[in-house]
Amino acid sequence: MTATDGGPGGSPAKRPVAGDGTSIRPMDVDLSTRYLGLSLASPIVAAASPLTGDADGLRRLGDAGVGAVVLPSLFEEDMLAEDVGLAAGLEEGSRVFHEAREYFPDLAAEKGVADRYLGNLERAKGLLEAPVIASLNATSRGGWTRYAKLLGRAGADALELNVYFVAADASRNAADIEAEQLELMSAVCREAGVAVAVKLSPFYTAMANFASAVASAGAKGLVLFNRFYQPDVDLDNMTVLPRVSLSRSADLGLPLRWTAILRPILPEDVSLGLTSGVHTGHDIAKAVAVGADVVMMASELLAEGPGRVQALESALREWLAEHGYGSVSDLRGSVSAASVENPEAFERANYTKTLRSLERLGR
């Protein structure tokens, strides 16, 4: 038996109801999902944040029933900064023996930042039954393939490659930048030994094409989208300030659109994680409906605490049961671009309609 529910742009989407005509109880709704080949008890994943880098935060997230956690990133900049002191001391020798310069940074970093990260990974694995996803924040290939392999061997259930890059160099074109990033992704996916998800920014020239290329490079998942921290200006001191702002539900629209568009384009075995703007049970339901396998949450958990996971799962169960869904799998992709009568609703079809709605607000 099926019923219909309104989709984007008024397009009906199929909605399953209990086959025997009985209502579904919230407690019977199955929230389990699969992400990067891993079995998760919940679609709620704790995104990288101070909570996932702290033993008490990890313990509380585990007690709340989170589906998985992403550890704070191992940053290329941290390892390079740690190398500076010793590198300066060997500068003269490096000029004579250039090969020493190539090997030295990785060796120095491995004794510091990387070792500490591996210790944090081991601690997280000991505290949690849920999968633990390590995170690499890279800007160049460098030694990242080796660190990806180390993290996989150290027990990470999967890796998230966070490619944070602002294309501010006018001498470089989009094709060259994308080719360089794809080479990095391919190398990491090839050497990691575990499934790799790539966390993308929304600023690629042709997102659908690039996302497909990332999957072809070996990524088993995409996370949409990387939340850039935007600078601000201090007018009193005429300086640039870093600003960290938490997301809001209003930020959900962009990742919703692209998850809906990419779900039917990407291979079925490529997972999709949606992040930025997920704060309520309804937000989670929307993300799953357009095709997300999981939602990544940081802002809401930082603001409300890890215990918020239980309230969100309860709200999601209630919504699913009320609308006749016995599991998140039943809902997944029911409002993707391939499932609605008017897929252009995710592109431009409602553009003029939206502008007219703004005109009414001004009257």
Mark where each language-model region is:
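Glycine-rich phosphate-binding loops at beta-strand->alpha-helix junctions
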Residues: 278
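Short gly/pro/ser/thr-enriched loop/turn and capping motifs at secondary-structure boundaries
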Residues: 76-80, 165-169, 229-232, 301-305
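N-terminal capping/small domains of soluble enzymes
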Residues: 22-131, 138-145, 319, 362-363
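C-terminal helical cap(s) of enzyme catalytic domains, especially alpha/beta-barrels
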Residues: 81-94, 233-247, 302-323
